[in-house]
């Protein structure tokens, strides 16, 4: 009988892991904000009931791998575009997803040791641990290669944006994890506790959607005209000097079409500049284009300033880098 129960628990945990990983991925990929508030509840429920640390490691790897396979799916067509074999591309995605899933071991390890302290301690530890790892991922990315994009708060970009002014993305992440961890822990607890959490969550979620509506519907006294240019530069031509003039000509054509339209801000795609913005010739060419439009430009470019990074530069109508 105990074997049957153990197998049933394993199947249940696997289903919960699958549900959480797929739901969270849908929240990111298809902008389904509400899933950001619900996706982790089954996962946290499984974690809360585990008494062996090796199972925490298994859950971490399983959830992380399944989530990142979906979140980083674009790596396969990107590698294929570069001539990499389909099987090698799939292997690269699987290996990267397994590596990325390591972060969840660090997230779930600390709450495991706080499980016996009850709902408040476990939920607060889970929220703190998750938020800390999100913060560290961004800091680590300044010195090493990692993927810090998937902050839980990003799933709420259409709803909780006004609140980031007060608490930042880390505050949003903390609240979302705290809510879901509390729900998961309280499923088998007293009904009064569950009711309080549900009422509080309904208040937070409804107020976030209301604030979005109020902010978006508030008339603005000042209007600006924004243009977005898209030169569609082939990445494999990007660093080939034989195509340098061709890329410049395409960008010049796009900029020329904006000259008489009184644009206030021109936004370039990430890394669209044909070369390094630090190079004197490239920057001089860029300044001429900026002055033609008499507008501010946000330009994405690789830069040697403080290391080699892709950065966004705000350039004034006079051709000076402001930020």
Task: Mark where each language-model region is.
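Soluble catalytic regions of membrane-associated enzymes that act on cell-envelope
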Residues: 212-323
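Membrane-embedded alpha-helical bundles of multi-pass enzymes
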Residues: 2-213
């Amino acid at each position: 009988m105990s074997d049957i129960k153990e197998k049933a628990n394993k199947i249940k945990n696997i289903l919960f892991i699958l549900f959480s990983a797929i739901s969270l991925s849908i929240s990111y990929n298809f902008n389904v904000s509400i899933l950001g508030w619900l996706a982790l509840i089954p996962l946290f429920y499984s974690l809360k009931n585990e008494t062996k640390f090796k199972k925490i490691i298994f859950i971490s790897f399983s959830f992380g791998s399944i989530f990142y396979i979906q979140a980083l799916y674009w790596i396969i067509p990107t590698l294929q575009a570069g001539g990499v074999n389909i099987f090698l591309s799939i292997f690269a995605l699987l290996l990267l997803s397994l590596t990325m899933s390591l972060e969840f071991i660090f997230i779930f390890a600390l709450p495991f040791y706080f499980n016996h302290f009850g709902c408040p301690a476990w939920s607060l530890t889970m929220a703190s641990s998750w938020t800390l790892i999100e913060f560290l991922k961004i800091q680590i990315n300044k010195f090493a290669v990692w993927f810090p994009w998937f902050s839980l708060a990003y799933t709420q970009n259409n709803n909780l944006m006004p609140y980031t002014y007060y608490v930042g993305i880390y505050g949003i992440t903390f609240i979302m994890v705290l809510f879901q961890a509390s729900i998961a822990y309280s499923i088998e607890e007293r009904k009064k506790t569950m009711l309080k959490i549900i009422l509080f969550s309904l208040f937070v979620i409804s107020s976030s959607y209301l604030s979005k509506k109020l902010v978006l519907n508030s008339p603005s006294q000042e209007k600006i005209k924004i243009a977005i240019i898209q030169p569609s530069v082939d990445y494999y031509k990007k660093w080939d000097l034989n195509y340098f003039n061709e890329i410049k000509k395409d960008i010049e054509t796009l900029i020329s079409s904006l000259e008489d339209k009184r644009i206030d801000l021109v936004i370039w795609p990430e890394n669209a500049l044909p070369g390094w913005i630090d190079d004197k010739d490239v920057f001089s060419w860029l300044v001429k284009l900026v002055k033609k439009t008499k507008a501010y430009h946000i330009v994405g470019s690789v830069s040697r300033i403080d290391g080699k990074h892709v950065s966004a530069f705000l350039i004034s109508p006079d051709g000076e880098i402001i930020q």
